[in-house]
Structure formats: structure tokens, C-alpha cells
């Protein structure tokens, strides 16, 4: 066997650590395999207390402090980092309105619509393509930007009072202009409009 082949398959703790460090201590089975860690080796690290199993296919280096958005990070990693936090979840991340989402809203690419997925408990899926220009980052996870978030919430049936409050806050902060809020205006038209 070639020495180069051995070097490629040897576990690389630094690589795994660097990957996890960029994701608040979390990593996936695939990311571990890319760093040379088999599931058997992960089990040994779990037994040794260096790694914890979070959910199917997702692990955490135990010496990282727990953060405030762990359920969001694990939902994003579950999507193989293809998803974007959206709707009420993104609204909450942006600090708009008073919504306390009971679900993690995650938008997956449109071509994932027909995939049969084992969706984690507490995650609500949406399907649409979200370009990079319409994303904001909150630590290690992406969420839809303010304009896209308000549009998604307007089309997704957020209560008129919450939608109006969030849109007014975004306008006051200068995060959006009135021209960015066509979907919000349309959703609020039967309820007196944005100024109602």
C-alpha cells in the first residue's frame, strides 16, 4: 500500500476540530469521514467522552461550550448544509416582531422537493432556491435576509399583526425600503394595509 494512501485515510484530529470549530463544535458523519474518522472510531471517541452523539448523523466535540442556537445548527447540518433558516425562524434571528417560533423553519433547494427525507422532529421544511445575495449569516448558520424573510412570512400566512410589526421594525431600522415590501402589502391589504 502506498504511503500517500495511508496518509489520506489516517484520522486527522486537527481537520475534524477545524471543521467543528466553524460550526460551534458540531460535525456530521460525512465531515468526520472526510477527516479520516469511521463510525467505529467515532464510537470510541464517544466512549472516551471526547465526542457526543447529538442526533442521527450529527456529533459534537464536548469541550465546546453550548451555544444559544444549537437546534438551528443541527437542523442546518442535517440538511447537509444545503438549507437556509427561513420564515419565522429567520424573523426571530433578525430580531423582528415578537414571534417565538415553535418550529425550526428550514428552506431546502427546490430540487429537494421530491426527496424522501427523515425530517427531524421540530423542523418544518419549505422548498425554494435562495440565492447567496438573499442570505444573512448568524454565526455558523445561514438565514434568509430581511426582505426575503418578510416576503416568505407574508406568503406563509404569518398573522397580520405580527407581519405588520416586523415590517414596521425593518423599515425603521433601514433594513428594507417600502418598495421591498410588495408581498407584505398584498398580505396586509385585507387588514388595512401596512399602515393600518
Tell me what each language-model feature is:
Residues 2-3, 88-196:
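Phosphate-handling catalytic interfaces
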Residues 1-85, 111-120, 128-132, 138, ...:
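Short beta-edge/loop segments at beta->alpha junctions of small alpha/beta modules
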Amino acid at each position: 500500500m502506498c504511503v500517500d494512501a495511508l496518509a489520506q485515510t489516517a484520522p486527522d484530529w486537527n481537520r475534524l476540530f477545524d471543521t467543528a470549530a466553524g460550526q460551534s463544535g458540531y460535525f456530521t458523519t460525512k465531515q468526520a469521514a472526510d477527516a479520516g474518522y469511521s463510525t467505529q472510531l467515532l464510537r470510541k471517541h464517544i466512549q472516551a467522552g471526547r465526542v457526543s452523539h447529538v442526533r442521527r448523523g450529527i456529533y459534537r466535540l464536548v469541550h465546546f461550550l453550548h451555544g444559544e442556537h444549537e437546534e438551528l445548527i443541527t437542523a442546518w447540518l442535517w440538511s447537509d448544509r444545503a438549507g437556509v433558516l427561513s420564515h419565522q425562524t429567520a424573523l426571530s434571528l433578525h430580531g423582528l416582531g415578537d414571534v417565538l417560533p415553535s418550529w425550526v423553519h428550514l428552506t431546502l433547494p427546490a430540487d429537494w422537493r421530491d426527496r424522501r427525507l427523515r425530517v427531524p422532529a421540530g423542523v418544518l421544511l419549505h422548498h425554494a432556491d435562495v440565492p447567496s445575495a438573499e442570505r444573512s449569516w448568524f454565526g455558523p448558520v445561514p438565514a434568509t435576509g430581511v426582505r426575503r424573510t418578510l416576503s416568505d412570512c407574508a406568503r406563509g400566512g404569518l398573522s397580520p399583526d405580527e407581519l405588520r410589526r416586523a415590517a414596521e421594525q425593518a423599515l425603521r431600522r433601514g433594513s428594507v425600503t417600502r418598495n421591498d415590501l410588495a408581498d407584505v402589502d398584498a398580505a396586509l391589504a385585507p387588514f388595512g394595509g401596512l399602515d393600518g
